[in-house]
């Protein structure tokens, strides 16, 4: 997709990426229907009527992050496309509404993300599902000032889950510190000594992963960080950093990287250098088919990541009732016939399911009532979650999902890693 002004709308009939994509130029902006109330006279917020609710998304739909970005729209589009086809979603105020999605491409550019938010804020009820830390940060303060929900977004930046700092926000995926910490705990439990080299993105994303990892290995006599470097999110190559890290003698490479092409080229470059450590990769840049296979990850003794959701690429995924329904709905309502290579499709689908839970508790068609209902979800097992994971929005400082499982690449997909030495 080549434009950042692309809109995707979920209707009560077939809708999806590539099927319904309307250029969002000069669209009239309006609030909720004047006669949409809670029955007791409370005026509706923008983006909701007695018949429908509209959600906004700004996310990368083109550029190097388009793969996972497109998934952030596809999953929720599929989920609500199916619900709309069944007649809509029942809300706590007694109304049944269809759910529409307006999605704009920000190309992973913070300025474009802010412009997209400004374009959407008056016509959508809430913003959701968008990918990226710098892009979501670009309009966080504006959303607070405008009192527009920015919720269940795909960033592990803890600021979005701090109620005092971000009263109109809530992240969906585990914070970066939780992911880095989970791997650190696994490594610290090893019976062997390890030298670690770190490469991280020079922003809150990279810093969060490193912070969690270092906290987990603090006091572990068997772990030594021997070299630590950073890169910029705008860099097109990290060959220089990899060459320097390869000379460190590290047997473990902690790579907190968010850019898909850079991860692939890093896997390839380290092999060219003859440096074959075990790797850690974040959950959003560890896809077996889209990243590990083209990068030649099977050459390394181990590639580890973390997860809270089932992988659509797993051999047994389509055999389960939820997995089969997901794939069918992705094809029918999101124009996504292939098995998703990125986990963001499943995450976005789970966001849709979580929002349906929240809608069912809304007693007024207002953003304030929505936020109150959102912060009261506990113990909800969304479709396609791994055993032991659940949605809990009641913990201040934590996103909707805070538990992760460390996994190890087996050449085709991932299997749980109970210990480093197994």
Regions found by a protein language model. Give the residues of each.
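Signal peptide-proximal N-terminal region
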Residues: 53, 75-100, 218-222
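Immediate post-signal peptide segment of exported/extracytoplasmic ligand-binding proteins
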Residues: 36-57, 91-98, 188-194
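Extracytoplasmic "Venus flytrap"
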Residues: 40-50, 56-79, 104-110, 132, ...
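Short, low-complexity disordered leader/linker segments with a strong preference
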Residues: 1-54, 420-422
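Beta-alpha junction/loop-to-helix N-cap segments that form part of ligand/metal-binding clefts
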Residues: 33-43, 67-74, 89-163, 172, ...
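Extracytoplasmic ligand/sensor domains, especially the bilobed periplasmic-binding protein
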Residues: 111, 124-227, 280-304
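Extracellular/periplasmic periplasmic-binding protein-like sensory domains
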Residues: 270-349, 417
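Segments of small-molecule ligand-sensing domains
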Residues: 332-345, 354-413
């Amino acid at each position: 997709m080549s434009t950042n002004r692309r809109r995707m709308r979920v209707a009560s009939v077939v809708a999806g990426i590539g099927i319904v994509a309307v250029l969002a130029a000069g669209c009239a902006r309006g609030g909720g229907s004047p006669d949409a109330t809670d029955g007791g006279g409370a005026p509706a917020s923008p983006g909701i009527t007695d018949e429908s609710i509209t959600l906004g998304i700004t996310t990368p739909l083109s550029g190097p992050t388009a793969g996972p970005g497109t998934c952030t729209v596809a999953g929720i589009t599929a989920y609500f496309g199916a619900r709309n086809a069944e007649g809509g979603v029942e809300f706590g105020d007694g109304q049944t509404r269809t759910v529409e999605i307006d999605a704009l491409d920000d190309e992973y550019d913070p300025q474009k993300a802010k412009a997209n938010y400004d374009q959407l804020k008056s016509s959508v009820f809430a913003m959701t599902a968008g990918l990226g830390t710098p892009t979501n940060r670009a309009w966080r303060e504006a959303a607070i000032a405008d009192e527009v929900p920015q919720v269940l977004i795909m960033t592990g930046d803890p600021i979005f889950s701090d109620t005092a700092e971000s009263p109109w926000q809530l992240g969906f995926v585990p914070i970066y510190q939780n992911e880095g910490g989970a791997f650190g705990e696994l490594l610290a439990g090893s019976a062997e000594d390890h030298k670690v080299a770190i490469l991280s993105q020079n922003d809150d994303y990279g810093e969060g992963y490193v912070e969690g990892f270092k906290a987990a290995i603090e006091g572990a006599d068997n772990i030594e960080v021997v070299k630590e470097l950073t890169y910029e999110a705008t860099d097109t190559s990290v060959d220089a950093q990899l060459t320097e890290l390869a000379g460190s003698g590290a047997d473990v490479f902690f790579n907190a990287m968010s850019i898909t092409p850079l991860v692939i080229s890093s896997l390839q470059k380290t092999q060219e250098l003859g440096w074959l450590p075990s790797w850690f990769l974040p959950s959003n840049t560890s896809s077996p088919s889209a990243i590990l296979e083209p990068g030649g990850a099977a050459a390394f003794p181990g590639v580890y990541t973390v997860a809270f959701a089932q992988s659509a690429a797993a051999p047994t995924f389509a055999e389960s009732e939820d997995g089969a329904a997901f794939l069918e709905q992705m094809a029918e309502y999101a124009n996504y016939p292939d098995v998703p290579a990125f986990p963001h499709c499943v995450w976005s689908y789970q966001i849709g399911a979580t929002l349906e839970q929240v809608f069912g508790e809304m007693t007024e068609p207002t953003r304030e009532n929505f936020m109150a209902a959102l912060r009261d979800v506990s113990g909800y097992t969304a479709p396609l979650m791994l055993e032991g994971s659940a949605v809990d929005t009641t913990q201040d400082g934590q996103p909707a999902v805070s538990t992760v499982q460390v996994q190890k690449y087996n050449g085709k997909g991932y299997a749980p890693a109970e210990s480093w030495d197994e």
